[in-house]
Regions:
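ABC-type nucleotide-binding domain
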Residues: 2-194
């Protein structure tokens, strides 16, 4: 589901951060300050236009409310997360942020306003610091370290052979899955979504 593969941090990025679907129209509404209300109403979705993956899904999240999607493999948790981030367009229904249809919001503004950590972590070959900074490329070292502390990753990072300068290889294969997840949380934190 979503975009797979590890891509070096250039103009191309992993599906989590800047995936673009060739058939999606860009929104026109500038979204500068997210209040945080999310409404999905009667959402239907299929990846291929034929086999429906989600049918008549509705949810409402109040500003500041934390929601966890739990369920069996294949139940649609990742799909819902991908739709909330508009990695795909829905077939039917509505998704609105603060009363604004998600299709009208500029994708860059939407993605900047959301912090998402998916179950499958995407890290790239580079330093720990570079992998955290990937959440916001202009973040300072101090901001990245603060994000790592917020994610409870700073202590394990400092125990690595080169600390924040430790090179990660092959999607972070030299880290445990839990450590990689903490880096992903730090990456989302440094992006500083409202």
């Amino acid at each position: 589901e979503g975009a797979d593969g590890v891509i070096e941090p250039t103009e191309q990025r992993t599906g989590i951060w800047a995936w673009r679907h060739p058939h999606q129209a860009e929104g026109t509404v500038t979204y500068t300050r997210l209040r945080g209300e999310l409404v999905m109403e009667g959402v239907d979705f299929s990846y291929d236009g034929e086999k429906e993956v989600l049918h008549d899904i509705s949810l409402w999240a109040k500003p500041g409310q934390k929601i966890a999607f739990v369920g069996a493999t294949g139940a649609g948790k990742t799909t819902i997360t991908n739709l909330i981030n508009r990695f795909y367009d829905i077939d039917d229904g509505k998704i609105r942020y603060d009363g604004i249809n998600v299709n009208k919001i500029r994708k860059s503004d939407l993605r900047r306003s959301l912090g998402v950590v998916l179950q499958e972590v995407k890290l790239f070959t580079g330093t720990v610091m570079d992998n955290i900074r990937y959440g916001r490329l202009d973040a300072t070292d101090e901001e990245c370290i603060a994000a790592a502390k917020l994610a409870n990753a700073d202590s394990f990072i400092r125990r690595l052979p080169e600390g924040y300068d430790t090179m990660l290889t092959g999607n972070g294969s030299n880290l445990s899955q839990g450590q990689a997840q903490l880096l992903s949380i730090a990456r989302a934190a440094v992006a500083d979504p409202p």
